[in-house]
Amino acid sequence: EEGFLERRGNDIVGLLTYHIDERGMEVLTLNSTLEGQGIGSSLMLSAIDRARERGCEKIWITTTNDRLRVIDFHQRVGFRMMKINLGVVDEARAIKPQIPLVGERGVPIHDEIVLELEIEPYLDTLGSEGNDSV
């Protein structure tokens, strides 16, 4: 796994981790301590640039159906819903019962959603202040 950090002064305010294989780049985590300040967008732009450098044709992220803010963010930066894995969380819960039944905003958790972004050369729509590679 590799990733990027976003700093404000001495504070780490964001982290994106990813894995690259022959299929492209999978974003594993994207976290920000400050919402609405462009941190997620900045980190995602860094990931897109890295994917381009490594010859990836796509980036994808998998999330659960209750993560409405995650789904919204990724669609705003150009990702498209590519696949819904129906009932996969229910199946996982049978093995790991501590997986919650209900998530964000009271939405029942049942499915995984795969969102994907096709990488286009030199597409710079998010704006980046630069992040530290980790």
Language-model features and meaning:
Residues 51-65, 73:
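Conserved GNAT acetyl-CoA-binding A-motif
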Residues 38, 55, 78:
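Short glycine-rich hinge loops at helix-strand junctions in the catalytic core
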Residues 35, 44-52, 75:
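A conserved short alpha-helix in the GNAT/GCN5 acetyltransferase fold that borders
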Residues 119-134:
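Generic C-terminal helix-cap and adjacent flexible tail
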Residues 41, 65-104:
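Conserved active-site alpha-helix within GNAT-family acetyltransferase domains
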Residues 1-35, 41-45, 118-119:
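Acetyl-CoA-dependent GNAT
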Residues 1-3, 109-114:
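Short hydrophobic/aromatic beta-strand or adjacent loop that forms the aromatic wall/cage
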